[in-house]
């Protein structure tokens, strides 16, 4: 089971379904605001989704705020290195807002308050190399995702889905030891906004403990800079302290927590927003 992707008007995109019990407005175009707001209300009335979650340009946020949406995060200079992006939410189910994972939130607050150790990982990485993945490897990629995630907000366990994403400006990268794929991740590139979401990190159980996510992230950053990308961001699991550490160590800024937002590994989890501005090389 996976959620549905809908395209609205001149380029707006939403994802919705019972898997995450939410609507996610992934992309908003100015001319589509009336149609998008109407569709969000229609889905709320028909499907009774517990949460509406929207990424919108700051200049287009007022109609959402007037309808009861609240800010949960933001990325400054997200759109072409100029305009801020706001992440706005409306909780139709009060319990989804109030039942916060207090233990996980406290662990993360402690992480933010402590100095991070910058460990030398070169010895761990000596046997690994990074390269961009190809369609012919989609089945192997899907197997690792299925091993790592019981459930995921997108059907990354499906090789056909991975191949389709490769055709739509999603770049997958793999860490190899010899010919064996040990870990992988993706960069979802939006050339219109000059941004990329660094996501879909997974490590085969036989290769954990080598900080391969950090190696992958560093390699993806270099690749994105070569493609003219200015803003990198991720939506990381609040519960995954190692993943949060990875982004903090590489200089990403924490910028908000999305409460009870995404179904991963069989349950609805809260997610942290991180971003980093980089100097595009072209």
Each language-model region and where it sits:
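Conserved GNAT acetyl-CoA-binding A-motif
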Residues: 44-56, 224-236
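Conserved acetyl-CoA-binding loop-helix of GNAT-fold acetyltransferases
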Residues: 31-42, 203, 209-226, 245, ...
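Conserved catalytic-core motifs of GNAT/GCN5-like acyltransferases
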Residues: 55, 70-86, 253-268
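A conserved beta-strand-loop-helix scaffold within acyl/acetyltransferase catalytic domains
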Residues: 5-22, 28, 142-205
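Conserved beta-strand-loop-alpha-helix junction that forms the acyl-donor binding cleft
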Residues: 53-61, 234-244, 261-264
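Short, cationic low-complexity segments
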Residues: 103-129
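N-terminal charged segments
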Residues: 1-47, 53, 61-62, 66-67, ...
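A short beta-loop-alpha structural element at the N-terminal edge
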Residues: 126-141
């Amino acid at each position: 089971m996976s959620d549905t992707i809908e395209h609205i008007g001149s380029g707006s995109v939403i994802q919705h379904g019972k898997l995450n019990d939410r609507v996610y407005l992934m992309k908003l175009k100015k001319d589509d605001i009336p149609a998008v707001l109407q569709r969000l209300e229609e889905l709320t009335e028909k499907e009774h989704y517990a949460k509406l979650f929207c990424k919108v340009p700051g200049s287009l946020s007022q109609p959402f705020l007037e309808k009861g949406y609240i800010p949960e995060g933001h990325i400054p200079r997200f759109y072409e290195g100029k305009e801020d992006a706001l992440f706005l939410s409306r909780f139709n189910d009060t319990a989804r807002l109030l039942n916060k994972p207090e233990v996980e939130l406290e662990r993360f607050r402690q992480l933010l308050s402590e100095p991070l150790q910058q460990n030398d990982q070169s010895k761990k990485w000596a046997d690994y190399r990074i390269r961009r993945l190809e369609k012919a490897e989609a089945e192997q990629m899907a197997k690792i995702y299925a091993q790592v995630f019981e459930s995921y907000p997108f059907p990354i366990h499906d090789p056909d889905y991975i191949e389709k994403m490769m055709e739509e400006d999603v770049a997958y990268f793999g860490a190899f030891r010899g010919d064996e794929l040990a870990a992988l991740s993706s960069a979802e590139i939006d050339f219109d906004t000059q941004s990329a979401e660094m996501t879909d990190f997974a490590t085969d159980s036989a290769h954990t403990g080598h900080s391969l996510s950090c190696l992958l992230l560093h390699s993806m950053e270099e690749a994105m800079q070569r493609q003219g990308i200015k803003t990198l961001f991720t939506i990381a699991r609040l519960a995954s302290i190692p993943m949060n550490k990875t982004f903090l160590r590489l200089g990403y800024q924490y910028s908000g927590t999305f409460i009870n937002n995404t179904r991963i590994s069989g349950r609805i989890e809260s997610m942290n927003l991180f971003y980093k501005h980089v100097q595009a090389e072209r």
